A protein has these predicted regions:
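Dual-mode signal for accessory low-complexity, basic/Gly-rich regions
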Residues: 398-417
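Conserved helicase RecA-like core
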Residues: 2-8, 14-401
Length: 417
């Protein structure tokens, strides 16, 4: 039975009710996970499940399809990874039985590494295939055998065309950040891939939003899903400070350079709306001798990996990024997020600022707002349910904290003769 809109609404109500279990289920043992998985979680320093894990793992262990909404850093990977690992441990077959689709190379790599850590005390093998790196090493990994395959749609389609990968034995399918996959134009590839996966399977579907297009795909591929949705997903943590600065568009770089004179900003990701703006900002910061690098879709995989690793090591003070390129990036000690450009949709704002103030640490989110971006900020504030703090722009200390209104020039009509 396929999911219908009414079914999804019913599941939302059930999920809200089920959230009460998070105060009852306080250990991974109570979730029904086997000792090898509990040992791996302990090795990773995880002593109690997150809310998304409390909601998703029990129905997943029962074989139910799961439709979920959860942010980066919520424990989402373990929410689908642990049930998959337990099932593979119970009935090992030596074939690729689980497929995880992710929109970007960075996210696919991050998921694969996390699953490998969770599988540490098992015989389950994990492989990742994605574009931007050599085809041969990934082909060799597939030949060695993998119980779980993590892939981006484009590279997986390449392997399927060359018949170097098969999906005949897939029992568990995961679509992570499905909304982003569709935004990036992967829907045709995703449909072709799913068509090669057996209809009799368990499906996990995670998406930050449920647009008409996403809802249509949900109805096609999910069967009687349990919906798990955290109402707190749009509420930044209390340790996060959020400040707006009113600034003309042409003065944004000057403002950022001025703010960087504060040595407390030692590690920051600056988000731009486009790749071209990311390039210009990085070049401008270099001229001011700010240690900076950037990641976006036009950078090679090796360039992106190098930039991220050196940023984590502290060799770069600022990492300039676009939203799509930054999805899947996990930096545990990020002090600041700077919205150089206000995102076009509120969901991207929460994705951005959610990268700082993690694990009870404090963090700062700074947003530059030009007059034409004020409607976007109002949308974000409406979603938040509160007005964000306005800071004094150090470039114009005596000016208003509100963005200047666009100047309207009225021209007198020529007199009729």
């Amino acid at each position: 039975m396929r999911a219908t809109p009414r079914d999804l609404s019913d599941e939302r109500d059930r999920a809200a009710h089920t959230l009460e279990r998070s105060s009852v289920i306080s250990t991974f043992e109570k979730l029904g996970l086997r000792p090898p998985l509990q040992a791996a979680l302990l090795d990773l320093g995880f002593t109690e499940p997150t809310p998304i894990q409390v909601l998703a793992i029990p129905p997943a262990l029962e074989g139910r399809d799961v439709l979920g909404s959860a942010e980066t850093g919520s424990g989402k990977t373990a929410a689908f990874g642990l049930p998959i690992l337990q099932r593979l441990m119970d009935r090992p077959r030596g074939k690729t039985r689980a497929l995880v689709l992710a929109p970007t190379r960075e996210l696919a790599d991050q998921i694969a590494k996390h699953l490998m850590s969770l599988a540490k005390h098992t015989n389950v093998k994990v492989a990742a295939i994605y574009g931007g790196v050599g085809f041969r090493p990934q082909l060799n990994a597939l030949k060695r055998g993998a119980d779980i395959l993590v892939a981006t749609p484009g590279r997986l389609r390449d392997h399927l065309k060359q018949r170097t990968a098969r999906l005949d034995d897939i029992e568990m399918l995961v679509l992570d950040e499905a909304d982003r996959m569709l935004d990036m134009g992967f829907l045709p590839d995703v449909r072709r891939i799913i068509a090669q996966v057996p209809a009799k399977r368990q499906t996990f579907f995670f998406s930050a939003t449920l647009s008409a297009q996403i809802s249509g795909l949900v109805r096609e591929i999910l069967r009687d899903p349990v919906r798990v949705e955290l109402a707190a997903k749009i509420a930044p943590v209390k340790t996060l400070s959020q400040t707006l600065y009113a600034v003309p568009q042409e003065k944004k770089t000057d403002l950022l350079v001025e703010l960087l004179k504060d040595n407390n900003i030692y590690s920051a990701i600056a988000f731009t709306r486009t790749k071209a703006r990311a390039n210009r900002l990085a070049a401008a910061l270099e001229k001011h001798r700010v240690p900076v690098n950037l990641i976006h879709g036009d950078r090679s995989q090796s360039q992106r990996t190098h930039a991220l690793e050196k940023f984590k090591q502290g060799q770069y003070r600022v990492l300039v990024a676009t939203d799509i390129a930054a999805r899947g990036i996990d930096i545990s000690a990020l002090g600041h997020v700077i919205n150089y450009d206000v995102p076009l949709v509120a969901a991207d704002y929460f994705h951005r600022v959610g990268r700082t103030a993690r694990a009870k640490a404090s963090g700062d989110a700074i947003t530059f707002v030009s007059s034409d971006e004020e409607p976007l900020i109002r949308q974000i504030e409406h979603t938040l349910g509160k007005r964000l703090e306005r800071g004094k722009n150090p470039l114009f200390p005596e000016a208003s904290t509100e963005p200047p209104k666009p100047r309207v020039v009225y021209r007198s009509r020529p007199r009729r003769r």
